[in-house]
Amino acid sequence: MKITDHKLSEGIALTFRVPEGNIKHPLIILCHGFCGIRNVLLPCFANAFTEAGFATITFDYRGFGESDGERGRLVPAMQTEDIISVINWAEKQECIDNQRIGLWGTSLGGGHVFSARAQDQRVKCIVSQLAFADGDVLVTGEMNESERASFLSTLNKMAEKKKNTGKEMFVGVTRVLSDNESKVFFEKVKGQYPEMDIKIPFLTVMETLQYKPAESAAKVQCPVLIVIAGQDSVNPPEQGKALYDAVASGTKELYEEADACHYDIYEGAFFERVAAVQTQWFKKHL
């Protein structure tokens, strides 16, 4: 395969993998999760898809990795714009069959793929893994009524302060993504990838709470495969099932790795099985 790096006019850094052969290839754009960068977790899937005959693109959202933008600023609507910017660039590449563009998203990116498809009919096929359906339920679902009211009041006060003063609190990623799985993962990778050791606005919690990928999924008519991990404590499998239920498409499937946790899908036997299932899905529907 041929691997090249590019920087788009919007400031988005991407890596473009193209299989051998002078033909127009179908394309899979891989969309990362919460504060993810393209060199972490994604290459194994990108390489597997490219070896199977698909061109692939991995990229950094603005504000992360090698892309431009305010460091750590995470807004789902902006990240969806980034996906569409990548589609715009990709369809102009001579080696790409621009009638066969698919999206693959993981975790938060597994929600973004529905937001992008709801806005852009050029997307012909979706794979979404380890995603959530409703950010409000994800963030506050285990709180009682008074705890939830107090939590929302605090967020609203912080948002008002930002509006009035322009100042806001920035915290480490694991202050927001505070489950044990994520703490272990981010602690492990930030030593190898210092660009993962960043501060993000605490109000990212509010962005997550207001984000409801199921609403976009209800507008999606293309083929959709949803992958969930049965032991996922970041985005519990019930969230993935709710997302599957919301998908409007008549061509949809739900695949579960019952014994996997959130970060297990990227290596070993879990990865081998999931990548094979996803590759077959793209071969059939893209």
Swiss-Prot record:
Keywords from the named record? Plasmid
Q: Which Gene3D superfamilies match?
A: 1.10.10.800, alpha/beta hydrolase
Q: What InterPro entries does the database record attribute to this sequence?
A: AB_hydrolase_1, AB_hydrolase_fold, Polyketide_trans_af380
Per the database record, which ranges form the AB hydrolase-1 domain?
Answer: 26-268
- Protein family: To E.coli YcjY.
Q: What is this protein called?
A: Uncharacterized 31.7 kDa protein in traX-finO intergenic region
What is the originating organism of this protein? Escherichia coli
